[in-house]
Amino acid sequence: MAAVCFSLSRCCSAVHRPAVTAVRFAQTAAAPAAQPRIKKFQIYRWDPDTVGDKPRMQTYEIDLNTCGPMVLDALIKIKNEMDSTLTFRRSCREGICGSCAMNINGGNTLACLNKIDTNTSKVTKIYPLPHMYVVKDLVPDMSNFYAQYKSIEPYLKKKDESQQGKQQYLQSVEDRQKLDGLYECILCACCSTSCPSYWWNADKYLGPAVLMQAYRWMIDSRDDFTEDRLSKLQDPFSLYRCHTIMNCTRTCPKGLNPGKAIAEIKKMMVTYKQKDAVAA
């Protein structure tokens, strides 16, 4: 019993004994400064509202150590810290809105998804989307593109509108899957402005982006106006200026295939014309 009490007393005394903390002194020093990584960006500049202003390339230098990884990060840094007159479109910074579509190092893409080439010996060249009127600097005039999109009536159309807004228009899983690879288009116009046929016939040829959206509604099982949509593409230009160059598919920043969608419309058009001929 005495041994137990002695053991408990030792434990209690150990609990109340002040702790001894070893303090180690170390000399601190600032982290060594990172070597500057200066990257040159040549950016298309032009303000048509300024009398005498002519298109030119303007060079900016950025330390990549103080900039985000994407080309859009560099553009925002230039505008915020170097030249507030630089004009470009941007919004989501996540490849969702399509606002920052431009031509970077010769290819149409989204600035928010395009990584800066860290090779500082190479200059990054940035232009607006090709073969479109320029509003200012990197901002193209999208008016014609949006007018063409509006012309295909990109929305669900029903012949019987008596139940409109009263019930859901259901479709099978299989029918819904047919829309995959079509509805994801963000209308950035990268594909259309990479298409030589669209360059020369933009006033008549609808272009890859708009035609892919037309196809999206043609094959929607809930839509009742497929034949009407096909009938509007019978002229020699709206659809048939596509020569399967496939620049559209190669350049799409969302990985979609407008070229395939156009080919499917052409196949549907054959059946439609045959049916139309029989009816006549």
UniProtKB/Swiss-Prot annotation:
- Which InterPro entries does this UniProt record tie to the protein? 2Fe-2S_ferredoxin-like_sf, 2Fe-2S_ferredoxin-type, 2Fe2S_fd_BS, 4Fe4S_Fe-S-bd, 4Fe4S_Fe_S_CS, Beta-grasp_dom_sf, Helical_ferredxn, SDH/FRD_Iron-Sulfur
Task: List ligand-binding residues for a ubiquinone.
Answer: W200
So where does [4Fe-4S] cluster get bound?
C185, C188, C191, C252
Cofactor: how bound: Binds 1 [2Fe-2S] cluster.
Task: State what inhibits or activates this protein.
Answer: Enol-oxaloacetate inhibits the succinate dehydrogenase activity.
Annotated transit peptide: 1-25
The Gene Ontology CC terms held by the record are: mitochondrial inner membrane; mitochondrial membrane; respiratory chain complex II (succinate dehydrogenase)
- Which residues are in the 4Fe-4S ferredoxin-type domain? 175-205
Describe the location of the 2Fe-2S ferredoxin-type domain by residue ranges: 39-129
Assembly and binders: Component of complex II composed of four subunits: the flavoprotein (FP) sdha, iron-sulfur protein (IP) sdhb, and a cytochrome b composed of sdhc and sdhd.
Could you tell me what this protein is called?
Succinate dehydrogenase [ubiquinone] iron-sulfur subunit, mitochondrial
| Species annotation | Danio rerio
